[in-house]
Amino acid sequence: MAEAPTERARVRRHPERGIYDPAAVAAILDEALVCHMAWVTPEGEPRVIPTIHARIGDTLYVHGSQASRTLRAIRAGAKVCIEATIIDGLVLARSTPKHSMNYRSVVVFGAPREVTDRAEMDEAQRALAEHVVPGRTADARMPNEVELKETAIFAVTLDEASAKVRTGPPLDPDEDLALDVWAGVIPIRTVAGKPQPAPDLRPGIVSPAYVEDYRRPGG
């Protein structure tokens, strides 16, 4: 998709970095571990929260709570803006104003709906768990009835989404190239450490392959 799906989804700052291809948007959302969802309360107060998300097709599911102000705002008709970012590198220029980051980000606009259908709720819960740790639902217990009643799941279509990506070296002006200052990129990536068993783990339970080999998609 060469054009922005809507005017408000169009990338304005550095438009050359804007990407509207649904596959590119999906790949970033699938790799990003968390997202931030912003909305405005009925009283006109801005809010933003970090949370987990999962994508199924062209629908983005976001985890929430039945006791949250988010749910009350959405039930009152609030629209949301959801953002996710992956940092790929620190870009060090020869002057501090020219420093930057290499990143991949997605912004989604939409009117969320509360998921109430039980089958869709189950599918979304499974997708959320698999988004964080692929393979986890093969052995971990899924939510019981009490836990489901405490949980809110919001669904937002990806009809109005855009990605923005920066890659490459610093962009120093010609007059700075003679400075005796190191310039370049420090690559950044998410790396899992050695798994730490729970202190109350029963003897004989070994960490599964999806724990020992954990990595983010694309990482």
Indicate residue ranges for each PLM-predicted region:
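A structural signal for short, well-ordered beta-strand segments
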Residues: 53, 110-112, 158
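Short, structured beta-strand-loop surface elements
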Residues: 66-127
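C-terminal edge-of-domain segments
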Residues: 1-9, 116, 120-219
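Structural motif
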Residues: 59, 79, 105, 111, ...
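Short, surface-exposed beta-strand-loop junctions and turns on beta-sheet-rich folds
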Residues: 54, 68-70, 169-172
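An N-terminal domain-cap segment
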Residues: 5-61, 72
